[in-house]
């Protein structure tokens, strides 16, 4: 009995709790609704807000939830509310390509949407890459003098090219065209126009801009023959007219033979840079490229001297519009320039390095084609007042839905689901309420059409009738009925326009004061006139500065941008897609997601698409820690190590796709090896032991541009020491040291002797000589007198 009683109590408690939560939610909705002062603002405040147009409705708030309006006796037929609708009209199942029928790669194909302003409708869109889908591959080749070996290689690889394409799809066609540059000064010397190879002491074809050699065909021998019969030409500068030629390949649909349902690919092969829009001025060509086909019957581009080169934007838009992908197969010397170009149109372009003689072109075609079919991206033509956001987990590549309209590394035959959020941000200025929107795959003629109907603004606001007799009667003939409320004539106010704006005619002061009190509220201000924040003037609150609302119950929104937010009782309620205290941030954190997949490296917050880093972190993604290693340096280190080892002949990097691609296995990072990095750039260090067993320090820098990663690497290969030379150096060094020591010793001795001799001479100069007074010379001297002197020649003893 006790157990049964406990269970009963528990059930009663749960029912009470659910009812309390539901009541709380309803009150929350009503709080958002009740401050809307017009039908349109009411329906925009919340999806469940409704407006009462009942003439007999007595409650002050006409904008509440449908349930609350019915509770306050608003007639059900006079309630105008939001009514969103989603209905799928065509939903063919996904299927692969068959010769008797076309493939279906997108489902559903058509749907109906009724949109409510400020409300989001979510619908599911599925995509699956079809097997054996048709491929149209057009080879556009630079045939200037430096590409002569590449032409010969392509000619020899014709049969192998056929087999390569068969391995990719069983339904393919090939076309061929060539280009050089505009045949005029300064692109070519006039005297060399007929033979631009004269400087090389050779003969070649006169310079031309673009020549269409072979329309798309499944005849491989015809393709090989077209390549073989094409002639080498030349130009003066190192810039080519590739964009001129590419524009013609794109827009000359009939001449090239593009098939609408095929995957259309242009592979542009060159070893030079491109002329861009404006370069034509150098040749006196001022007319802008008209994006029209100008091929004569021989396939020659006749507008080369009439129209400037196209811009990258013009090329990009035409590629998108006609669903054509472009592969830039370029040499290593110019690849960095094409990486930057491809980053501007990454969803429809691919760049890879071409070997010096184009011998790797088959591998390049296979690799780039597989990369293209592994990527799917959707775009739409929605007007600016309708927002469309895409969410997907890319077939399980992410643990949760990510805000993105593309997926990489899509497996052939695997279904990818996208969830499309469609939101009506505002009503169109032209008051057109039916629209057609196409959501299409950017590389294929696969799409979903949306028939969109916009829920019109409140109908009662569209046809005001100031002269309606019944409406004027209800408004005391001093106004007219407008959406269930009296719109008073000048000089009158009040619920029924029975209060003159001249205060001297007030008949019932207490009745007018009552109109300045909130009709129902749980707040303590319900008995206060104008919430104690204003004065009651003829039944209408005149609010003090800083307050607003019918009863001055709300603070003003000082920082709300009216274009981005609505002010509801002192709070900025951001419109769809905007956030922040001032609603000036679009709420998209995609720009703050670094290569590691983390928002601001988990060291900051994303505000207005920029990382606001915590102290002491720095960098675009807060990846730099002044006291520790750079987080992105560590992220890229395995990839760079692998690339350096591969370049230095230490083996093939087998897991390159895994460690050198983004988290969703996007195409391998573009990279470039240089002899020396810019010392002004912040460099990352990678330390590895080379094949000689020597530890070497190499350096690299990374660039992240619109989620595309670029690596520039300075690989240092430390060579082993030359022992013979080392012994020679040591011996020579030892000999030099010995000679130096001997020289120093000799110099020291000589210097010492010189000092002592100088001292001796100085002492000699300063010495004084005199005899000692007590000194007696031991030698006596006697002098014989002259008288006793004898001549030596006389004999004194002679007689």
UniProtKB/Swiss-Prot annotation:
Q: Give the VWFA domain ranges.
A: 136-372
Answer yes or no on keyword rRNA-binding. Answer: no
- Carbohydrate attachment residues: 73, 167, 409, 505, 655
Write out the GO biological process terms.
Answer: apoptotic cell clearance; cell adhesion mediated by integrin; cell migration; cell-cell adhesion; cell-matrix adhesion; heterophilic cell-cell adhesion via plasma membrane cell adhesion molecules; integrin-mediated signaling pathway; melanotic encapsulation of foreign target
| Membrane topology type | Single-pass type I membrane protein
SUPFAM superfamilies attached here? EGF/Laminin, Integrin domains, Plexin repeat, vWA-like
Q: One matching Pfam family, short form?
A: Integrin_b_cyt
Q: Which Gene Ontology CC terms are recorded?
A: cell surface; focal adhesion; integrin complex; membrane
Q: Which GO terms describe its molecular function?
A: integrin binding; protein heterodimerization activity
Signal peptide (from-to) = 1-26
**Residues in the Extracellular compartment per record:** 27-725
Q: In which tissues is it expressed?
A: Expression is confined to the developing midgut endoderm and its precursors during embryogenesis. In the larvae, expression is concentrated in the midgut imaginal disks. Expressed in embryonic and larval hemocytes (at protein level).
Q: What is its main location?
A: membrane
Q: What does this protein do?
A: Contributes to endodermal integrity and adhesion between the midgut epithelium and the surrounding visceral muscle. Essential for migration of the primordial midgut cells and for maintaining, but not establishing, cell polarity in the midgut epithelium. Can only partially compensate for the loss of beta-PS integrin during primordial midgut cell migration. The two beta subunits mediate midgut migration by distinct mechanisms: beta-PS requires rhea/Talin and beta-nu does not.
- State the family it belongs to: Belongs to the integrin beta chain family.
Q: Tell me the protein's name.
A: Integrin beta-nu
């Amino acid at each position: 009995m006790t157990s049964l009683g406990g269970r009963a109590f528990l059930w009663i408690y749960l029912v009470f709790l659910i009812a309390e939560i539901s009541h709380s939610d309803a009150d929350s909705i009503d709080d958002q609704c009740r401050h809307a002062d017009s039908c349109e603002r009411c329906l925009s405040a919340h999806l469940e807000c409704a407006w009462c147009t009942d003439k007999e409705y007595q409650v002050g708030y006409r904008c509440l939830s449908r349930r609350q309006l019915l509770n306050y006796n608003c007639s059900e037929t006079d309630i105008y509310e939001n009514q969103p609708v989603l209905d799928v009209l065509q939903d063919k199942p996904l299927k692969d390509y068959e010769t008797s029928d076309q493939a279906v790669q997108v489902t559903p194909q058509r749907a109906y949407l009724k949109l409510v302003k400020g409300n989001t409708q979510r619908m599911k869109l599925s995509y699956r890459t079809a097997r054996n889908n048709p491929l149209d591959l057009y080879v556009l080749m630079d045939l200037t003098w430096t590409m002569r070996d590449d032409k010969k290689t392509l000619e020899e690889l014709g049969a192998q090219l056929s087999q390569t394409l068969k391995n990719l799809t069983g339904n393919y066609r090939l076309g061929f065209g060539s280009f050089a540059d505009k045949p005029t000064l300064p692109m070519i010397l006039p005297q060399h126009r007929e033979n631009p190879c004269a400087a090389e002491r050779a003969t070649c074809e006169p310079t031309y801009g673009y020549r269409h050699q072979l329309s798309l065909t499944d005849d491989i021998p015809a393709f090989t023959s077209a390549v073989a019969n094409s002639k080498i030409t030349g130009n003066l500068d190192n810039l080519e007219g590739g964009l001129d030629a590419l524009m013609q390949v794109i827009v000359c649909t009939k001449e090239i033979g593009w098939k609408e349902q095929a995957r259309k690919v242009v592979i542009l092969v060159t070893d030079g840079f491109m002329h861009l829009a404006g370069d034509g001025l150098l040749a006196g060509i001022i007319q802008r490229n008209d994006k029209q086909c100008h091929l004569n019957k021989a396939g020659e581009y006749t507008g080369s001297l009439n129209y400037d080169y196209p811009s990258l934007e013009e090329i990009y838009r035409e590629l998108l519009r006609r669903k054509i992908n472009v592969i830039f197969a370029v040499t290593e010397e110019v690849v960095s320039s094409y990486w930057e170009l491809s980053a501007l149109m990454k969803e429809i372009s691919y760049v890879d390095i071409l070997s010096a003689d184009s011998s790797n072109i088959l591998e390049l075609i296979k690799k780039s084609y597989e990369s293209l079919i592994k990527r799917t991206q959707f775009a739409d033509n929605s007007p600016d007042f309708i927002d469309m956001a895409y969410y997907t987990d890319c077939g399980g590549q992410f643990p949760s839905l990510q805000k993105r309209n593309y997926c990489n590394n899509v497996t052939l035959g695997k279904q990818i689901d996208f969830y499309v959020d469609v939101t009506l941000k505002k009503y169109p200025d032209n008051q057109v309420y039916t629209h057609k929107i196409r959501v299409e795959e950017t590389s294929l003629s696969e799409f979903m059409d949306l028939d969109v109907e916009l829920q019109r603004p409140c109908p009662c606001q569209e046809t005001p009738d100031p002269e309606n007799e019944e409406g004027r009667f209800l408004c005391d003939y001093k106004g007219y009925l407008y959406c269930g409320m009296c719109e008073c004539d000048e000089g009158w106010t009040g619920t029924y326009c029975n209060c003159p704006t001249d205060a001297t005619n007030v008949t019932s002061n207490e009745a007018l004061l009552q109109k300045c009190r909130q009709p129902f509220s749980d707040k303590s201000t319900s008995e206060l006139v104008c919430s104690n924040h204003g004065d009651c003037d003829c039944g209408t609150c005149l609010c003090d500065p800083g307050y607003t609302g019918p009863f001055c119950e709300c603070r003003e929104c000082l920082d709300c941008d009216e274009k981005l937010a609505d002010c509801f009782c002192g709070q900025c309620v951001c419109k769809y897609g905007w956030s922040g205290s001032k609603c000036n941030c679009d709420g998209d954190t995609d720009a703050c997601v670094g290569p590691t997949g983390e928002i601001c490296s988990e060291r900051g917050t994303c505000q207005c698409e920029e990382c606001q880093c915590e102290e002491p972190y720095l960098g675009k993604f807060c990846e730099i820690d002044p006291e520790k290693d750079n987080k992105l340096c560590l992220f890229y280190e395995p990839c760079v190590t692998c690339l350096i080892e591969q370049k230095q002949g230490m083996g093939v990097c087998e897991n390159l796709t895994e460690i050198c691609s983004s988290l969703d296995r996007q195409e391998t990072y573009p990279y470039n090896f240089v002899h020396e990095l810019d010392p002004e750039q912040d460099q990352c260090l990678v330390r590895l032991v080379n094949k000689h067993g020597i530890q070497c320090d190499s350096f690299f820098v990374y660039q992240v541009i619109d989620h595309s990663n670029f690596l520039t690497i300075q690989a240092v290969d430390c060579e082993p020491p030359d022992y013979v030379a080392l012994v020679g150096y040591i011996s020579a060094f030892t000999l030099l040291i010995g000679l130096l020591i001997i020289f120093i010793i000799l110099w020291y001795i000589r210097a010492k002797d010189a000092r002592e001799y100088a001292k001796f001479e100085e002492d000699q100069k300063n010495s004084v000589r005199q005899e000692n007074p007590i000194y007696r010379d031991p030698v006596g001297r006697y002098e014989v007198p002259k008288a006793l002197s004898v001549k030596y020649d006389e004999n004194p003893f002679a007689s």
